[in-house]
UniProtKB/Swiss-Prot annotation:
It comes from Saccharomyces cerevisiae (strain ATCC 204508 / S288c). This is Transgelin. The gene is SCP1. The keyword Acetylation applies. Present with 1578 molecules/cell in log phase SD medium. PROSITE patterns: CH. Residues 151-164 are annotated as: Interaction with SH3 domain of ABP1. The lineage of its organism: Eukaryota, Fungi, Dikarya, Ascomycota, Saccharomycotina. GO terms for cellular component: actin cortical patch; actin cytoskeleton. Has actin-binding and actin-bundling activity. Stabilizes actin filaments against disassembly.
Length: 200
């Protein structure tokens, strides 16, 4: 028996990551890139990998500022700068994530800083942007297109009809709803409490 061979098993995190990645084809990633640059930033998308374009956090901060301005009319909500220093880039990514959380993106659809900066989980980065587009579209339908299906709106529950008058007599037991017990009690049903029972 050989112990050198690696077991053919994967962790749950790895399985979930692969499942997420399978949902984003190159075409889907390109659509996300178009949404970020053309639809929101009104810029020409640079060539190359989308994650590399987003890695320094400047594009994400500009994206957040535009969405914030559309809501409040205030510009430059997040300060940013082009920098090659890792801690500056990661801080800018973190600021974008804080904005997205307040904007409405669910916690389970938000990536972590290292998912983008170290490319640990590209799919969740794409999922965050896709989710952000849905919330932006919900708030400003005419300005920001949506990636994928729109957010569903919760429909109010239909009104519950009140009970008929013959069921509203205030009794604790309704024979119309629960049946008639025919005066059942412990004595009539042979229920013995605290005494010996003979089971035949």
């Amino acid at each position: 028996m050989s112990y050198d061979k690696k077991a053919d098993v994967t962790s749950l995190d790895e399985d979930l990551r692969q499942l997420r990645e399978s949902k984003f084809s190159p075409e889907a990633i390109q659509n996300i890139k178009i949404w970020v640059y053309k639809s929101v930033l009104k810029e020409i998308a640079p060539p190359g990998d989308l994650l590399e374009c987003l890695k320094d956090g400047t594009v994400l901060c500009k994206l957040a500022n535009i969405l914030y301005e559309a809501d409040t009319g205030e510009a430059n909500h997040i300060s940013w700068k082009s920098s090659k220093m890792p801690f500056v880039q990661m801080d800018q990514i973190s600021q974008f994530l804080s904005f997205s959380r307040k904007y409405g993106v669910p916690e389970d659809e938000l990536f972590q800083t290292i998912d983008l900066f170290e490319k640990k989980d590209p799919a969740i980065v794409f999922q965050t942007l896709k989710s952000l587009s849905r919330y932006a579209n919900k708030k400003h339908t005419d300005r920001f297109p949506v990636l994928g299906p729109q957010l569903s709106t919760k429909k109010p529950r239909p009104p519950v009809k009140s009970k008929p008058k013959h069921l509203q007599d205030g009794t604790g037991w309704s024979t119309f709803e629960y049946g008639y017990m025919k005066g059942a009690s412990q004595a009539t049903e042979g229920v013995v409490l605290g005494q010996r029972r003979d089971i035949v």
